[in-house]
């Protein structure tokens, strides 16, 4: 079954319409490939402007206990980065709380996204505080650290 799942996944990804192919061939996929297909479908929805569908798919992934916590956290982060216009900054920040207040590989990116939501809501000091928290994290990439420093400068902190 793994070989068939791999072949189905590969053919869908190489085709002209991966989303349609995944919907038709979903039963041929193993759980892992189904998860990857769901991420691809959500990404395509986001890229086509259907933010509501993308958010719904990412949130469903984030709540799926059958997939590893790392992927659930990634789905939560992507849901927050692809919210429809009807969502408020507070909605985004609330969505990110499990990532911003916990430790993990997405904490810095979640803090950055939450800071962006604060800026959108006009809460510049709260945004600068979150950006400062990023700089205190030990395990973040140099580009994320640099973005945090630059964003704080743009927001008026030297």
How would you label these PLM feature ranges?
Residues 2-12, 35-42, 73, 77, ...:
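Alpha-helical tetratricopeptide repeat
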Residues 13-69:
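Extracytoplasmic/periplasmic/luminal assembly and interaction segments
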Residues 45-51, 55-158:
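Soluble extracytoplasmic domains of inner/organellar membrane proteins
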